[in-house]
């Protein structure tokens, strides 16, 4: 078993940070404590509801939990050197684990991954840390959608996998690529839930007013141009079009 490291930085770069060794109680015994530790160090925002002020976490706690669990379960224990690591920046959190994914990163949602650490996965399921194989990323995506965060970025390096969860960002500050990635994540999540991706659902995802439906159409077009989604039935009129992930056509065929 490799020890989990947690590093918190002062800003958005790695210039200056305090490293904390975590996981001394083991993955199962220390999982709850690690969640509490992260929860206490992540930023919160003050909101007002019914005249009452309260603080709400910037990052959805359920997404953090699933990303930590995935990082532990899917690490490659045969890779030497560093173990799982969580890095906290002012604008993002990075979760890094040894090893590269056993499936295409575009299929993290909707495809059951082969088990790399069967005994560890079964144990963590038995103690209530993880659930059915392949369901973690659906929960992460659902939380990202609910909180209208940018889509997580998955980076595969030579012997490591890194998932970046971004802090909330106004639609106007998201790049074209980030918007297309969010459209793709939305489309995949709805596809595996047997729901349609439409202009209406995209407007709801990004908080776009009904009178600005053309803006939602541009987002869908950009995602298609990027090769991420397809029109389900090209014979259907523009207003009634439904969209699916690019890989769904090959899957049906």
Regions found by a protein language model. Give the residues of each.
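C-terminal regulatory or interaction extensions
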Residues: 1-253
């Amino acid at each position: 078993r490799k020890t989990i490291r947690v590093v918190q930085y002062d800003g958005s770069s790695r210039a200056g940070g305090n490293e904390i060794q975590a996981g001394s109680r083991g993955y199962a015994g220390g999982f709850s404590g690690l969640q509490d530790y992260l929860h206490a160090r992540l930023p919160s925002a003050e909101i007002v509801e019914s005249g009452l002020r309260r603080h709400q976490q910037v990052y959805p706690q359920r997404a953090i939990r699933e990303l930590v669990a995935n990082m532990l379960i899917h690490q490659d224990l045969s890779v030497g050197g560093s173990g799982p690591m969580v890095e906290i920046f002012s604008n993002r959190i990075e979760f890094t684990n040894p090893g590269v994914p056993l499936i295409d990163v575009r299929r993290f949602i909707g495809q059951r991954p082969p088990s790399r650490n069967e005994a560890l996965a079964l144990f963590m399921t038995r103690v209530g840390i993880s659930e059915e194989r392949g369901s973690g990323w659906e929960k992460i995506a659902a939380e990202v959608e609910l909180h209208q965060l940018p889509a997580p970025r998955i980076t595969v390096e030579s012997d490591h996998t890194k998932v970046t969860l971004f802090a909330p960002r106004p639609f106007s500050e998201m790049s074209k690529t980030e918007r297309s990635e969010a459209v793709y994540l939305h489309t995949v999540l709805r596809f595996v839930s047997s729901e349609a991706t439409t202009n209406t659902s995209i407007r709801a995802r990004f908080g776009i007013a009904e009178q600005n439906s053309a803006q939602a159409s541009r987002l869908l077009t950009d995602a298609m141009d990027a090769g991420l989604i397809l029109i389900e039935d090209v014979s259907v009129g523009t207003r009634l079009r439904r969209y699916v992930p690019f890989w769904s056509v090959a899957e049906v065929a």
